[in-house]
């Protein structure tokens, strides 16, 4: 029974705080492969969710590969799921290729294309959809850098929120003298400064890298002020810009009032924990009123756990060194006992929030084995399992031993060294888990992969072959 519950816990914890599905093209006007009798005024694309049409989102090319759209991309009727681009007047009869590169609600670019004709189907286009989109995708270095920026962003939130809550909930001021209190405060400020600096750097890099990814350009090209303005005009840019401003506000509050005045930092710290939900599908997928609070609770629980581990490793030892050896065990035992209880509550919160989110986002257990998203989850399963095992070692061995040493008036000794070793391993694993989480958000979950038409085009000699399966769901499908 215990093993089954542990496995369920690990599987749930391995799921991302907010599954990030990608937009899917559902229909087009003119239809894919259709022959329009008269020239349409515009090409319209309908997606399964609201998308953003920055960065030259929709383009139309004639058979020779020359652009024939007017470059003005709009949302018809203000509907976020619709995108349209006007066509230049007086187009000749023949085949045309429309391509799209849009931004999903989760901030990820989605691209594709289709062929249609006006009057009659003319010569096959000189370039395939893949050829026309080939120069508009970010390279592997940009994608890897974006993953690092996301991971650093998660770690920064954990460091800042976790350190503040550790000092408020887990630090036993009644067991610490002035010297220990001063040492703890000094090291805590160092952790907070590192988190704030990392968050600011990750935020700036993330905005630029989003411009490179969405526009299919290099990092250096995305430094252009025009590209940055376009990113800030998207939902992704608004959320990441808000987080940057919030980090500045929080840093100012901590600089003026210090971490011991929660009234000064509570609001910006809460906003920092809310922003991941605002930037993901929790804020756009039904039921929003349930998913957003769950996502925020998930982030706070993660921050308490991961940030608390860092404080235990960095700030608490500095505080104990300021005391006589017998008093060290008392302070260390009291701190670890409090944090152990809080960490257990955090794990329970992660279990609850992850369970509900998994019900919303996952379709079948087989998806864990047969999708990139699922395989990434399985990797995270192993890491989380190791993390829980190390925490169990501390709870079952280190905590009781430290309590006993405190009662007997002895120094922490071997128990303290064991605690430090396991904490180092836990922090290292926690950082890797956050990195895997950053990688997970680049994959669409199985629920998104199972919806919408699938199209693929290829060139065979002088012919271009395009196959479309619509709607690419279980049941009746049309193949064109």
Where is each model-derived feature located?
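Short, surface-exposed alpha-helix to beta-strand junction/turn motifs within ectodomains of secreted
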Residues: 43-72
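Short proline/glycine- and polar residue-rich coil/turn motifs
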Residues: 74-80
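Detector for glycine-centered tight turns/loop "hinges" at secondary-structure junctions
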Residues: 33, 65-66, 107, 462
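Bacterial N-terminal signal peptides that target proteins for export
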Residues: 1-6
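Bacterial N-terminal signal peptides
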Residues: 7-16
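Polytopic transmembrane helical bundles with strong interfacial aromatic enrichment
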Residues: 17-20, 24, 83-93, 97-480
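Contiguous beta-strand segments within globular domains
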Residues: 36-45, 473-480
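Short N-terminal segments immediately surrounding and downstream of signal-peptide cleavage
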Residues: 23-38
